[in-house]
Amino acid sequence: MKDLVKFLKAQSKTSEDFDVIKIGLASPDMIRSWSYGEVKKPETINYRTFKPERDGLFCARIFGPVKDYECLCGKYKRLKHRGVICEKCGVEVTQAKVRRERMGHIELASPVAHIWFLKSLPSRIGLLLDMPLRDIERVLYFESYIVIEPGMTDLERGQLLTEEQFLDAEDRWQDEFDAKMGAEAIQALLRDMDLEVECETLREELQSTNSETKRKKITKRLKLLESFIQSGNKPEWMVMTVLPVLPPDLRPLVPLDGGRFATSDLNDLYRRVINRNNRLKRLLDLIAPDIIVRNEKRMLQESVDALLDNGRRGRAITGSNRRPLKSLADMIKGKQGRFRQNLLGKRVDYSGRSVITVGPYLHLHQCGLPKKMALELFRPFIYAKLESRGFATTIKAAKKMVEREDAIVWDILADVIREHPILLNRAPTLHRLGIQAFEPILIEGKAIQLHPLVCAAFNADFDGDQMAVHVPLTLEAQLEARALMMSTNNILSPANGEPIIVPSQDVVLGLYYMTRDKVNGKGEGMLLQDSREAEKAYRTGQAELHSRVKVRITEYVKNAIGEFEPQTHLVDTTIGRAILWMIAPKGMPFSLFNQTLGKKAISKLINESYRRLGLKESVLFADHIMYTGFAYAARSGSSVGIDDMVIPQKKYEIISAAEEEVAEIQEQFQSGLVTAGERYNKVIDIWAAANERVAKAMMENLSQEEVINREGQPEKQASFNSIFMMADSGARGSAAQIRQLAGMRGLMARPDGSIIETPITANFREGLNVLQYFISTHGARKGLADTALKTANSGYLTRRLVDVAQDLVIIEDDCGTHEGIVMTPLIEGGDVKEALRDRVLGRVAAEDILKPGTNEVLISRNTLLDEKLCDVIDENSVDSIKVRSVVTCDTDFGVCAKCYGRDLARGHLINQGEAVGVIAAQSIGEPGTQLTMRTFHIGGAASAAAKESSVQVKNTGTLRLTNVKFVTNKEGKLVLTSRNTELTIIDTFGRTKEHYKVPYGAVLNHADGEEVTAGETVANWDPHTMPVISEVSGFVKFVEIVDGLTVTRQTDELTGLSSIVVQDVGERATAGKDLRPALKLVDAQGNDIFIPGTDVMAQYFLPGKAIVSLDDGAEVFVGEPLARIPQESVGTKDITGGLPRVADLFEARKPKEPAILAEISGIVSFGKETKGKRRLLITPMEGETYEEMIPKWRQLNVFEGELVQRGDLISDGAETPHDILRLRGVHAVTDYIVNEVQEVYRLQGVKINDKHIEVIVRQMLRKAIITNAYDSEFLEGEQVEVARVKIVNRKRAEEGKPLVEFERELLGITKASLATESFISAASFQETTRVLTEAAVAGKRDELRGLKENVIVGRLIPAGTGFAYHQNRQKNRLVGGMENTTEVKLSAVDEEEIASEFTFSAEDATANLAEMLNMADDAE
């Protein structure tokens, strides 16, 4: 019995006792040590007896018995012979499952290069030997010789020789030198390498070389060599002499009926290798001619290549049915590979699926589960109950009872199911709310019933959706399901912290209908004592639901000690609102109910309820809201009839007026007054305006009706038209859809996004004619095609986001940093896009928040800003707050709770162990399908409007200018001479109200700090040209302006005025190439004038295309334009919107024409030009001049002699995030990405908290490039995790050494995922082969930090409830490392006790083992 316990312990050797997974190269000895014997024959099994052939690929002697505890010839059977090796057939008597783990090997007759290290770019073998891949392949595939030992000859080591050269050399030097071909040669070269010496020489070379490319190459080699030295891998192991053979049960051979076999492709590949290997051995024994042996060796190399990675080199080897065979590499990579198919996505037992239907009578925490399904899912529980209650004697009997469906079974089922939560999941599970727990209620029928309020979270509807049910089996699982996943615990959305349990559709319509008011309804003006009486009046028909009445309302308000005190008022309200008040929980104000409730208002109700009263009350309230909404929606009798779509009378006038305008434009076009493009834009403008007017007329018509009030006077009230009510309440439909039903359909788009100029003037009520129908099919199909593509793209974006962020978990409470990012309200132009309180809500303050203008601390640092504190911020009109952020968090391999702030789905500071990375990825990815795929082509109409030419303020306040340089012109107005000037309006409290960018050359009517009033124009400029502004007064002097050489004269036909146009350098004659036309300002005597305060001459160089209207010697005053540079219109560019834009931002892609930013601060000048580029020089105050070549066609925003700051725009365009990071730092790039991503989502009306985007940005910024390594373990130019550098720097700071210098690097999410520390995570994401090759050569260790790695090795994830488990393991590991050196010895008594506790059941091991053990026990 003792042995048995030991045996079982050995059998169930847990996979828990490892903390790191290391990957490396296998040495030949290691492969032999894994092996249980050599596979010598290609045979698999005997086709008659089906027994494995000896020494073949399925040999029982090597791999273990085919049947449990039975040798092949049948001499030894049963458990008592365990461990015996049969002398007849040589098979060990043991369990058959060892055939899954025992490996074999093949001794190769000639070495073979491993294809991964050869062909996976960059080729590791090539890099080590410093040879091009082509040369290595020529040696390997026997095309040329390579010199291994030159001896006393004038050959070089590693030199290639052709057949002829080799024969010549042999004649000259006989056997002085050694040259070989094939893998032996490569192996010999690798074996003879002295890595340490090689490293030294490379280091010296690195010091002495100056060329950038050489340095890069040397660094690459150096890294590889160092990783070989550190990992203990030997280079020659990249060439194999022994090939491991996979255990046979992992490449099974299955007999099909009809005498054929289904086999794994690997068997074919192995057979091919063995055949060729045996043939080669025979040829070598025979001492066959060289050419034959060589050919055989080459074929062996090819067959091993195919086994390891088929199709990597040459054509893929195909099987009998002409498809390529699946090699070992194919087994693990791709969606169908081991990682993604079996390790990350397993199928789950105890699950079922069915169609869902609506369950309007359920509570929020319940779902209806069909009896049939429940019986099947809870089977084992029922068996146990039947047996424990004595209804069945054995499991078998219980099984029979369940199959017969005896009456008692149903009672037991009800008992088992009570309070046993189940999980419901709807695919696609886009965020964590896609799986929630419910308590099952048994129902008849075959469809699962779902509570209507959770539909929004599941994104479910009842048009045939299916859902899957899973049963949490263990107590822990049930506990987690109840405490964390119950639908009642998921009221708020993790993406934005707003309620996700919001009523929609019928419920909204019912509540809206119930809370509407009506003029002169029946019973208007009644005085009622409370809600009960109001309901009575309604039920008895004394009053209508919408009548305006006075009711006594009792509200409950919390007093100082937090108890509810009743307060009663008489309130003007309606019967319906009074009835609705009956379901309001204590502590809610009546004002929230005393209004017409639309969808937004109802959402606010639930939000308020959650914030004021907590979870339980809110859940009950939400349920009541739903029941009430359904009831009154039924009573309202709203329906859609064709007469509800009222077509406005004005429609036909508006359309005919538009047609006349269009005809007029057409005439202008034909007489040549407008161009074709202008005509098109104007026509589209006209029709768009007409459509708006029709829509407006229609909505006015629909939304109001005139009724007679009690005084007999006509009064307007909101209409009770069903269609209008549905749209107005937010239940279904929108103004845009009603416009198509009762207005006009309007302009249609082609699939490429351009607009068809013939509008559809009809609406759906009138019906479309054939042409109109045809036009509209165009766009409609595009819509469907888009949706299909969008789903896939959005899913892929989510996958990349999850992958980059999966290992980000909250691992400590406070990292103690003082860093943070400064939040200000988001203002664009004159409107506040997002108020400050919305941006800082749920964040932690990084510094004390002071009352503006004083030193009084309002809120101290490290305080979580909740709703109450945000009110304080609002009241004191604070306009910028520094808050902690994930991006600036100092925690090494995770984030701290303080930097993250509030857990949006729970409303308090986030807990440790929360997987914030995955939550962020899901929150960003989940709305992805709602984003458009289109790139918008903006019509001329839109782009003309986009060109602003003035700033008109909307609020009264103080004008503030930042980054400003100006001169004052003779009218006393300011003329800007600075580039990126920003103009802000600040109110009396010092809050920013408006924010504008003002271009160079704008004329300002007010100076900095002056008061302006609302509606006033404070700045204007010409949007089509950029002026060159004179900074001094004087006389113009032309410099190098030669007519016909550098400039041409042009005369305006209409005005007759002539002007000079500067030619582009490329268009000038050769003589004019080096001339640089300029305008110089001189005084009356002709002396140079200097710009005030500098020693710079007032001389303005003119770029190509500049227009000068002044003549030589003309007088100019300060602030007047000397020349104009026409600006090309920017309106024609595509604006990438929607999903592609988000993907571009997260992938940190460079835009097509990036903005050019100043790399350093200094004075701009231009150097010698080349053919297509000009040379920009920036000279700083001290230090060396920076120069950059810029293409001629780029428009520059700077003039010669201008002072720029680092990071200023030199040429317009889209900014590259990499530039922003390099020149303006981490904060700027975070701001940029967050705002740009939010811009896309805001357009679609999707709310996502900034935090989530910051989390992704943190992951994109987790690598750094070492710029100065000193004597640390890093190399210069190496890419390292920032956390690693920080750890090293802390250590160096303690030792008093200089800190390693580094630059943060921004990686796109795909790159960042592949560059993660964990090779398991990277390999399961993309490019599996490359990742594993790199990891193996470097001998990487995977610390199993992230979630993905732990899922793959089959452990609890280090997040959520698994977080504590992992922390304990770490503690125990530290303690255990000291103590656990001696082995624990049990006393005999303990052994006995343990043994007596063992009774074997089918779960312990495989069923047959249990039976056998019990039999063996009986026998003893």
Swiss-Prot record:
InterPro entries: DNA-dir_RpoC_beta_prime, DNA-dir_RpoC_beta_prime_bact, RNA_pol_asu, RNA_pol_N, RNA_pol_Rpb1_1, RNA_pol_Rpb1_3, RNA_pol_Rpb1_3_sf, RNA_pol_Rpb1_4. Signal peptide: none annotated. Zn(2+) 1 binds at residues 71, 73, 86, 89. Keywords: DNA-directed RNA polymerase, Magnesium, Metal-binding, Nucleotidyltransferase, Transcription, Transferase, Zinc. One of its GO terms (biological process) is DNA-templated transcription. NCBIfam families: rpoC_TIGR (TIGR02386). This is DNA-directed RNA polymerase subunit beta'. It comes from Histophilus somni (strain 2336) (Haemophilus somnus). The lineage of its organism: Bacteria, Pseudomonadati, Pseudomonadota, Gammaproteobacteria, Pasteurellales.
